[in-house]
Amino acid sequence: MKMLTRLQVLTLALFSKGFLLSLGDHNFLRREIKIEGDLVLGGLFPINEKGTGTEECGRINEDRGIQRLEAMLFAIDEINKDDYLLPGVKLGVHILDTCSRDTYALEQSLEFVRASLTKVDEAEYMCPDGSYAIQENIPLLIAGVIGGSYSSVSIQVANLLRLFQIPQISYASTSAKLSDKSRYDYFARTVPPDFYQAKAMAEILRFFNWTYVSTVASEGDYGETGIEAFEQEARLRNICIATAEKVGRSNIRKSYDSVIRELLQKPNARVVVLFMRSDDSRELIAAASRANASFTWVASDGWGAQESIIKGSEHVAYGAITLELASQPVRQFDRYFQSLNPYNNHRNPWFRDFWEQKFQCSLQNKRNHRRVCDKHLAIDSSNYEQESKIMFVVNAVYAMAHALHKMQRTLCPNTTKLCDAMRILDGKKLYRDYLLKINFTGADDNHVHLCQPEWLCGLGLFVCTQGSHHPFSTPEECCHTQTAPQQVQCQWNWDHILSVLCKHVCANGVQWAGSPRLHHLISVIVNCSSVLVFLDC
């Protein structure tokens, strides 16, 4: 009897009757964006936040979901209009919602591999003249996947995609686990790993001589590996951990309240280091507000510069120091996004929900007791700010396009169209021979090379201030360079750093003593209340 290959066994497992029944509850609810093309890129975005209780999906994630999704569509549009990048080849998309959950994202991602399974025996469907048969109702064959956002999502999806040799580029997943190429051998990213944030956070603590702190991490790969890296850096600097707490995936309010109670049990540890997802950060700050608990927060990019994290709880967030991956706004995206409305954006099935949530109105007649949306409502500078990782989404799409472009030029030298050699993509060849070797100028006019993401290790340092229109200071670009960060030379402005940080931090009852030099932070530029630092890679 002929032995089944691993792929055939997996095929049987995925499409057995029992497995399909387990997915049945989601299929009729699933929304997606499918735009056909000569080559199709998959997309995974946390369009909805994770639900509560038995609900898989929660409210619309306006910035990290809708904006990032539209950034991919924007990049695809720009590439398809480009006469020099993939000329004669149209890129399509298949975009799915992860609902900010790794398990849900894995189920959704089965759509990407289903196309690979149906294409395995495509040669059997050749016409007598040698042309390919027209097959109806078949899934789009995915050339590569852009996403996910959360590290836990990217890890689950990477484990699946590698079995089918489908390259994947994340625009936001920073877990150090994903640097293991022996396990994640089809994964790449346009952001640096968590190690650099952990190192920066430890240096900030050492700078202020905060040697007794508490930590809170989100359960999962992002929070746990991030806080583990921080603890290693803290030990090197003789920083002691008073209590180390975790927030589980249940998203139950009382779990956040209990964490705050545990933190309050250590009254001498007034500084709390957070390596948490954005939704967990928001719930923890809300719990601190309910308890009227005052801490000095030092948080990773899961919080970053998101004003939504502290909305309604500003009084317990003043003085927070948060990190964000340094990026440049993509100005063309601003114009694109501000031109969208429910009447011209029909390709995004989540946009109407986003619009109703953003403007607190109904596009139907007074649904849910809301007022009917005014047709003159618009996205503009008064209600919109570009999400911090839009640049990384755009760069991820362009990275995949440049790799496909070089592959097409090599395999199809005599035509701008797709030749037979590229109709069934060799994902292994695409990833190793082209994607890891791409070199181009990204959306920020900076050098993009996926093999060395450490070159992109700029970190924005934000301070949550009181009495300003925007509660977080906004960093300016620092020492924009195409060279490695260790070659960058900028001057520290210590007086300004102290005036910005100490004014708000020391007001919370935290004593500052001493100013040891931050040996691993080598460059800074200051503008008003903004500080941008680069790590010594």
Language model: regions and residue ranges:
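Membrane-interfacial loop- and helix-cap regions that link adjacent transmembrane helices
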Residues: 316-317, 327-384, 407, 411-413, ...
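Acidic, Ser/Thr-rich intrinsically disordered and amphipathic helical segments
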Residues: 40, 55, 71-74, 78, ...
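Juxtamembrane membrane-interface segments at transmembrane-helix boundaries in membrane proteins
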Residues: 27-32, 57-58, 93-96, 129-141, ...
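Polytopic endomembrane small-metabolite transporters, centered on the Drug/Metabolite Transporter
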Residues: 460-537
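Extracellular/periplasmic bilobed ligand-binding domains
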Residues: 226-349, 353, 357, 390-397, ...
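Signal-peptide-cleavage-adjacent N-terminal segments of secreted and extracellular proteins
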Residues: 5, 10-114, 140-141, 150-151, ...
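Segments of small-molecule ligand-sensing domains
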Residues: 372-461
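Extracytoplasmic ligand/sensor domains, especially the bilobed periplasmic-binding protein
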Residues: 26-28, 32, 103, 114-249, ...
